[in-house]
């Protein structure tokens, strides 16, 4: 399913989701916690691709919930590299949620998850995974920076400029044509 995930074949992705759901029934969280957490992480990855393809926020939210559930089983103390992998998956799911909702708090949380994974990968010499996660973190932080750069900050002069209800009666066309509309003007016309 990895190639199909990259290509985004929705039918294959739906089959993969169903397979993961069936596997969760066989590998119970309490009887087979390690296998169950692997299934949950795989499910989260598939849900990310599918949710992004069909632009479904609820599917992406299920991806996040799958990661969080897996993180209750895999901890940094008991399975650090697997925990970091789930953190990376969580970061990706949160990144996509931010992309599809415009809620940049998800992007901040995404960066936190990537940083947590990167720390563990660094401590355990997992260079290849650290490289992947570092690229994810850079992309997440770039998106946050771009979003903050796009926020409009009014110039100083605009902060004191107030439009009021009485401004709708102002003759903007006359103003733009050079007529101030002010008959009591002290300015004399030069002929």
Question: What is each residue range found by the language model?
Answer:
Residues 1-5, 34-49, 81-96, 128-142:
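Conserved alpha-helical positions within TPR/SEL1-like repeat arrays
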Residues 1-15, 48-61, 96-109, 143-152:
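Short coil/turn connectors between adjacent alpha-helices in alpha-solenoid helical repeat scaffolds
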Residues 34, 45, 49, 53-82:
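Alpha-helical adaptor scaffolds
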Residues 20-28, 64-73, 112-120:
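Amphipathic alpha-helical segments of tetratricopeptide repeats
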Residues 129-191:
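Terminal, low-structured helical/coil segments at or just beyond the last alpha-helical repeat
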């Amino acid at each position: 399913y990895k190639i199909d995930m990259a290509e985004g074949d929705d039918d294959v992705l739906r089959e993969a989701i169903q397979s993961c759901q069936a596997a969760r029934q066989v590998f119970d969280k309490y009887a087979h916690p390690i296998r169950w957490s692997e299934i949950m992480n795989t499910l989260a990855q598939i849900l990310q691709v599918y949710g992004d393809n069909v632009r479904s926020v609820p599917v992406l939210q299920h991806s996040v919930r799958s990661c969080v559930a897996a993180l209750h089983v895999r901890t940094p103390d008991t399975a650090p590299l697997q925990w970091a992998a789930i953190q990376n998956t969580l970061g990706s799911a949160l990144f996509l949620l931010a992309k599809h909702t415009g809620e940049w708090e998800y992007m901040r949380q995404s960066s936190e998850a990537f940083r947590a994974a990167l720390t563990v990968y660094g401590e355990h010499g997992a260079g290849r995974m650290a490289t992947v996660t570092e690229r994810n973190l850079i992309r997440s932080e770039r998106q946050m920076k771009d979003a903050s750069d796009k926020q409009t900050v009014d110039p100083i002069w605009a902060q004191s400029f107030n439009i009021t209800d009485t401004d709708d009666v102002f003759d903007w066309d006359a103003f733009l044509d050079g007529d101030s509309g002010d008959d009591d003007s002290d300015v004399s016309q030069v002929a």
